[in-house]
């Protein structure tokens, strides 16, 4: 599955979250680090959902850019 992620640059770090998986977040010192961490976090999050016996949410979010 391919989930959309949002990456935000802070003053000293990068943060990432997955709109389709509430609570699935990661923080890293660089963009490459946060991308690695969010991938691991998604895998861990999905495993937890499976273990609970819950249904895994299908990816439904998408991203677009708007020029202003």
Which role fits each region the language model picked out?
Residues 22-31:
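A short, exposed loop/beta-hairpin motif centered on an aromatic-Gly-Thr core
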Residues 17, 35-36:
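Short, surface-exposed helix/turn micro-motifs that flank interaction/cofactor sites
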Residues 7-21:
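Short aromatic-glycine-(Arg/Gly/Cys) micro-motifs in beta-strand/loop hairpins
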Residues 20-23, 58-60:
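Hydrophobic residues in alpha-helical membrane-spanning segments
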